[in-house]
Design a protein with these regions (language model features):
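C-terminal peripheral helix-coil segments that are non-catalytic and often amphipathic
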Residues: 1, 134, 138, 169-214
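Generic hydrophobic, amphipathic alpha-helix propensity
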Residues: 9-20, 37, 58, 62-70
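Amphipathic alpha-helical segments that line or abut small-molecule/effector binding pockets
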Residues: 18, 85-100, 154, 158, ...
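Amphipathic alpha-helical packing segments from all-alpha helical-bundle domains
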Residues: 118-142, 150-162, 177-185
């Protein structure tokens, strides 16, 4: 695990959101209470109310934490010195490292927020999912493939998410970064073809071998 991939939990709000994620993972959404969140976060009820409002607002904000981190990763790794696909390949590595370092938040995004959340909270998961699909679909702009079927991004992302959920439910968070080369290949090949996808998968593999990853 890379320490700099751990999301911060220093302010009262950050501690409350991490506590929300950890408790949600442990007891489910229906088991969340403001008192339990405050106890786990080490904050007073007044601090929780000022920082988060109520339990549903805290749950919504907790899912937004890792999604915002993903957006930051994609933005940080964009560079005019490399192709969009290369930036995406590096982003996949970084995102998987983030997921491994933040298991409670990862569980929310890939399991709880998808299946066990009220509509307002589930909508956050859906918006994050749509962002990733749209990101992949942008690869068509640089594709040389003649056949460009619809919903390709959705299919590619769905396949990767199924593998991620399997590893999460088995408690194998530490294995997630090692999946990066396969995920890069699976995400890129429908858009860019096998040869380019293999090159990008190798880029992801080489990035994984760097300590720390950039």
């Amino acid at each position: 695990m890379l320490p700099d991939r751990i999301l911060p939990a220093e302010t009262a709000r950050e501690r409350a959101l991490l506590a929300t994620a950890e408790l949600w993972r442990k007891v489910g959404y229906e088991g969340l209470t403001a008192a339990a969140i405050c106890s786990r976060a080490g904050i007073e009820a007044e601090e929780f109310e000022a920082a988060c409002g109520d339990v549903e607002a805290a749950a919504k904000a907790a899912i937004e934490v890792p999604l915002a981190a993903v957006v930051r990763v994609v933005s940080e790794l964009y560079s005019p010195d490399r192709s969009e696909a290369e930036s995406y390949a590096l982003a996949i590595v970084r995102i998987l490292e983030l997921m491994a370092a933040n298991p409670a938040y990862t569980f929310l995004v890939y399991v709880a927020g998808r299946q066990m959340a009220p509509p307002r909270v589930h909508a956050v998961y859906h918006s994050g999912h749509q962002f990733l699909v749209a990101m992949l679909e942008r690869l068509w702009a640089s594709s040389q493939l003649r056949d460009q079927p619809t919903r390709t991004g959705l299919a590619a992302l769905g396949a990767a998410e199924a593998v991620v959920r399997r590893e999460i439910l088995a408690g194998r968070y530490e294995r997630l970064p090692g999946l990066a080369p396969d995920f890069v290949y699976g995400a890129m090949s429908p858009f860019l073809g096998q040869r380019e996808a293999l090159r990008l998968a190798d880029l992801g593999r080489r990035q994984l071998q760097r300590e720390p990853a950039n």
